[in-house]
Amino acid sequence: MATTPDAAFETLMNGVTSWDLPKEPIPSELLLTGESAFPVMVNDKGQVLIAASSYGQGRLVVVSHESYLLHDGLVPFLLNVVKWLCPCPGAPIAVHSSLASLVNILGDSGINALVQPEPGEALGVYCIDAYNDALTEKLIQFLKNGGGLLIGGQALNWAAHHGHDKVLSIFPGNQVTSVAGVYFTDISANRDWFKVSKEIPNLRLYVQCEDELEDDQQQLLKGMSEIYIEAGVIPSQLLVHGQRAFPLGVDNSLNCFLAAARYGRGRVVLGGNESLILNQTMLPFVLNALHWLMGNQTGRIGLASDMKVLKSMLPNSSFQWSESELLTSDLSVFCCCSLANIDSEEVEEFVAEGGGLLIGAEAWSWGRRNPYSSCMTQYPDNIVLKRFGLGITSHVAQRGSFPFPNPEGTNYHFRRALSQFESVIYSRGSSLHESWLNKLSQDCFYMFQMTHQRISIYDSVKKHALKMIQSKDFPSVTEQYPIARGSSQAFLLSLAYELFKSGVDRSQLLPPPALLPPTESPITIKISTDNDNSWVSTGLYLPEGQVAQVLLPSEATHAKLKVLIGCHRDNISQARTYFRPPVMTYVYHLTSSQTSISWLYGGLLYIMVPNKYNQDNVSVTIRGAVSAPYFRLGKTTQEEWKNLITHSKAPWGELATDNIILTIPTVNLKELQDPYPLLQLWDKMVRAVAKLAARPFPFQRAERVVLDKQISFGFLHSGYPIMGLISIVEGIISEFKIRSHGIWGVIHELGHNHQKSGWTFPPHTTEALCNLWTIYVHETVLNIPREQAHPSLNPELRRQRIKYHLNKGAPLSNWIMWTALETYLQLQEGFGWEPFIQVFADYRTLSGLPQNNEDKMNLWVKKFSEAVHKNLAPFFEAWGWPVKYAVAKSLASLPEWQENPMKRYTAEGTEGRE
């Protein structure tokens, strides 16, 4: 028996070389929404005319016109269908009287079939048209128990008499086939051209058929004008991806936090947090939701323990309640905050056969606990919710007040939006709004998580996305050819990235590569516990489009080692204009003895070593990459360096000491004939940084500085690595320029890296304290006095800042940046650098440090006063610090600071704080 969609398709199409259809009948396009459903016959417009699926233990084939089942030209295919549907050899084949002549067609081919008014108790195959509404329950149970059902029909005539928007929900055939995720629609299908596919054909992204979803939306939101998500409630964003799923509540960025769906004969309402349901302000919505979920049913509403408060919240309702953790047969609706403890097949069948499901849950906390897991396929609730066309994501929605309904937000739907973008790509439609494109990018991230299981409704999305990339070629973005955020090109970049992450081979995304540099002999890097929590440079570069192999011992496959391709870590997606791709790095987890690695943009290679790494002397071998310029102080010889910069084709290289590593464009490195004096100077500067911070030296993890064409903000920012624009390259690789002009920016960022929360008072000192390191390095290493190191430290400007601050009454709101720095400069000029080193060292030994600024500032007053053996309370009070009475009293026994520089300003008549 064929057990996978691919095997089933092969069985159904065995020996079928052409589609011979009658010309007169007008078929209905079929809509596929179920995970088990797949197309069998698709026309040149992408419309499905024949589909197959399964439900419970049984199988189903749906044909878009009943006359096709009586057409001699389809006999070879019909024989395959009966064979595939038959649960076991010799099982009975029965035909409803509406298709009586099918008995003769099958008989002529040696298959015995009988006309029967309904399926018999013995499981076999039953053939029927799609217009019978008396056998619905029997057909569903026959299918569920293991029978094979062949059904054909079209809904066009029915729609003309009963309403186009009712077809999906009420058309008799859909009452049966919908449980397996297949629908007859009110759309006529093109009959002109059919191609026999060798593999499962692709589905359209979105079928523009009429539905009741707009009416459903209105019914669910009746009486609601807005929703207020209060502080403390953090809802997850929801992915609304099924054709019959729709958003209800969205924030200002189109992030959905409340949604609903029809699935089979049942309905689902989903909130991105249980508080969106278990909240008094949401009672009107909850009442609407429960009535909508009940539909025409009369059973009880089941309440899981985490939802039983609903009963007391709705004391005057006419509902019959039942507290239950299980989906019992007497329930019409089930309410819960988690589906983790209920079998997913049970939940799917409950909804498919008419049940209603109300659930409120978030996944952002799960995402934080499982950062490398697939939210859509591994988060327990999503295992079943994704079948309903919904998903709970690990991203959070905004909080605040949002209108109900929001036309722009509730009109956005993932499949519809991607389909519209596809029309733009093929010049068949107008461009999408930037907000839709931004939302689409994020939704693709989650949608592509579901495309590893060969499920047509998911795989088809990936295939369409890949075809868009291939039709327009891979987007190139450079300084000469920038791309605007929100443009079609920007979305294609994002789409390519998400496709690559989902497993699409880079050869399907990138154009054929130019002649690649020859690969080097395998390089082996030793990883030890000394590399704990760091990136280990390999001195190798992986060109774009090239594949390398990473090998490591089997005992190291659980060590959580990773390979990082590229070091330009800033995600610049929020920039208005891109001068390079928004995401330039990619990480592979080394969980097997051999890992193939590649990346759309190539990059320098690093081994990422986790925190608390405990395996020593592990050999990691890389083959298939090329050497990059890499000079390590004390190891690389002058001759080796000259050879590297002469012959390397890698665009980036590195200059390294044990304490700092600089990533520089190769074109700039070629001008550096001897990096030794430069790196000696850098080592002296970072030694000074460590000394002031009272940190051990050499560093356990070297600081990193990476230059880039474009970074996330500013021209430099702190972090690991420190990121800076290429325009500053001369200022960091020229020993002469550093010694003569200083290097304020990078040392400023190093200062940020060494600031500690306990003695930083945001926002006042965030950009002030870090400058202590710049001044210290300039004065103690470069012999550049502070007034020359930065123009803002001109003595007269400093005096003016102090006077201005005091004339305003020394408000704390004014004590920021250069004004805040002045306080520390006065302390340094009065007592030298040693007290700072001592106090920073003391802070490293303290536990239970205060978290608010006032308490942190008072601790600093106390600590610094004790370090210099002076009562500094009056000094800090003059600056406007909120010195507490108890702290001032505890310091009163210390000698007065006679040289307090603030006295000079008060003596001049400036009003200071008492």
From Swiss-Prot:
Pfam family, one: Peptidase_M60
Tissue: Prostate-specific. Present in both dorso-lateral and anterior prostate.
Domain annotation Peptidase M60: ranges: 533-832
InterPro entries with a match to the protein in the record: Class_I_gatase-like, M60-like_N, Pep_M60_3, Peptidase_M60_dom, TCAF
Family: Belongs to the TCAF family.
Function, in words: May play a role in the regulation of the cation channel TRPM8 activity.
Further facts: May act as an autoantigen in prostate autoimmunity.
Name this protein carries in UniProt: TRPM8 channel-associated factor 3
Native organism: Mus musculus
Gene transcribed to yield this protein: Tcaf3
